[in-house]
C-alpha cells in the first residue's frame, strides 16, 4: 500500500472515529476518546502522562511538569514507604511508576475503565519486572471492586471530573480506605467568577457542548465550596481543596501552542487528531475560551480513625 493510500485510509478511519465520538452522550466522551485515539494520545505524551502538569518557573517541558503534578498529588496523599495505594483512573499509569520509584509504597493497584490503558500499563509493568508491586485492572471508579479498609491511600489524578457521579467515587474511596487513610485528587472544576469578597451564591460559567466542560457530568459541575462539602458528607475529615490553577492552566496552554508549531509533532499524529487539537486550543469555542472559567484543584481528605 502506498503512503498516499495509507494516509487516505487513515483519514477514513479517523472520520469514522470522530463520527462515533460526536454521537455519544457528553459524559461518555472522555472514555471513548481515550480508547478511539489511544495511538494519538501515546504520540502526544512525554513519559506516557495524559495530564496538564504542574509548571514551576523554569520548567523544561511537559514530562517535568507532569512529574511535578504527580509529586504534588503524592504529597497531598502522604504516600510513603510500605503504603498500599489505589490509583483510580490511572491513564497510562506513568505516575504510578514514578511513585513506585520515588515513594517506595508496598504496592500500587490501578483501576481504569479504558482497556487500552490497562493493557499499555500492564505491559510496561511486565517489561520493568514490577508487576508484583504494580497491578492494573479494569474497573469503575464509582463501583470499586475491593473490600472495605484495603488501602492506606486512594488517588485520582485528573480523571475524577468524568466520574458519573463523582460523589459515588468519594463514598467508594471512603469505604476502601483504612481508618486514618487519605484520599487525594487532582481535579478540574468550574471557577467561581464572583469578584473577591462578593456575597451570594457562586457564579459559574455554563458548560459548553463539545469541549472539556461538556464532557463533565452536570452533577460534577460544582465549585470548591461544594466539592469540600461533598467530601465531608461522604464521611471525610481534614478536608482541603486547594487551587493550583496558576501553575497548571495557562502554562499548559502556552506549551501546546508552541507544540502545534512543531512539524515533527504534526507528523507523529493523524491529521484529524491534529486538526481537532489545534481547533480546541486556538478557538474561543474550545479550550482557549473556557480555560479562564476553569479551576484546577488538589483535594485531600482523611478517613477518621487510627
Curated annotation (Swiss-Prot):
SUPFAM superfamilies recorded: S-adenosyl-L-methionine-dependent methyltransferases (SSF53335)
Reaction catalysed by this enzyme: erythromycin C + S-adenosyl-L-methionine = erythromycin A + S-adenosyl-L-homocysteine + H(+); erythromycin D + S-adenosyl-L-methionine = erythromycin B + S-adenosyl-L-homocysteine + H(+)
Gene Ontology MF, one: erythromycin 3''-o-methyltransferase activity
List of residues binding S-adenosyl-L-methionine: 157, 162
EC number: 2.1.1.254
Functional summary from the UniProt entry: S-adenosyl-L-methionine-dependent O-methyltransferase that catalyzes the last step in the erythromycin biosynthesis pathway. Methylates the position 3 of the mycarosyl moiety of erythromycin C, forming the most active form of the antibiotic, erythromycin A. Can also methylate the precursor erythromycin D, forming erythromycin B.
UniProt xrefs under PANTHER family: GERANYL DIPHOSPHATE 2-C-METHYLTRANSFERASE, ZGC:194242
Name the record gives this protein: Erythromycin 3''-O-methyltransferase
Source organism (scientific name): Saccharopolyspora erythraea (strain ATCC 11635 / DSM 40517 / JCM 4748 / NBRC 13426 / NCIMB 8594 / NRRL 2338)
The organism's taxonomic lineage, starting at the top: Bacteria, Bacillati, Actinomycetota, Actinomycetes, Pseudonocardiales
Amino acid at each position: 500500500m502506498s503512503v498516499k493510500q495509507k494516509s487516505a485510509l487513515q483519514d477514513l478511519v479517523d472520520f469514522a472515529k470522530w463520527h462515533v465520538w460526536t454521537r455519544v452522550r457528553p459524559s461518555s466522551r472522555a472514555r471513548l476518546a481515550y480508547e478511539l485515539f489511544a495511538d494519538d494520545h501515546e504520540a502526544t505524551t512525554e513519559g506516557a502522562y495524559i495530564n496538564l502538569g504542574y509548571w514551576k518557573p523554569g520548567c523544561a517541558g511537559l514530562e517535568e511538569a507532569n512529574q511535578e503534578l504527580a509529586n504534588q498529588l503524592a504529597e497531598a496523599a502522604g504516600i510513603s514507604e510500605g503504603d498500599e495505594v489505589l490509583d483510580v483512573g490511572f491513564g497510562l499509569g506513568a505516575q504510578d511508576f514514578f511513585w513506585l520509584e520515588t515513594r517506595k509504597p508496598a504496592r500500587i493497584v490501578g483501576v481504569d475503565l479504558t482497556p487500552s490503558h490497562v493493557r499499555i500499563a500492564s505491559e510496561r509493568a511486565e517489561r520493568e519486572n514490577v508487576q508484583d508491586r504494580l497491578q492494573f485492572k479494569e474497573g469503575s471508579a464509582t463501583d470499586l471492586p475491593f473490600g472495605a479498609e484495603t488501602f492506606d491511600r486512594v488517588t485520582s489524578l485528573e480523571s475524577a471530573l468524568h466520574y458519573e457521579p463523582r460523589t459515588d467515587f468519594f463514598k467508594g474511596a471512603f469505604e476502601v480506605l483504612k481508618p486514618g487513610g487519605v484520599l487525594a485528587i487532582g481535579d478540574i472544576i468550574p471557577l467561581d467568577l464572583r469578584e473577591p469578597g462578593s456575597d451570594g451564591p457562586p457564579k459559574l460559567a455554563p458548560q459548553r457542548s463539545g469541549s472539556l466542560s461538556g464532557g463533565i457530568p452536570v452533577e460534577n459541575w460544582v465549585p470548591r465550596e461544594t466539592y469540600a462539602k461533598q467530601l465531608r458528607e461522604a464521611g471525610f475529615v481534614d478536608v482541603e481543596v486547594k487551587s493550583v490553577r496558576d501553575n497548571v492552566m495557562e502554562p499548559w496552554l502556552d506549551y501546546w501552542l508552541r507544540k502545534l508549531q512543531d512539524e515533527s509533532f504534526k507528523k507523529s499524529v493523524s491529521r484529524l487528531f491534529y486538526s481537532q487539537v489545534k481547533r480546541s486550543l486556538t478557538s474561543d469555542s474550545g479550550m482557549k475560551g473556557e480555560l479562564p472559567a476553569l479551576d484546577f484543584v488538589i483535594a485531600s481528605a482523611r478517613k477518621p480513625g487510627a
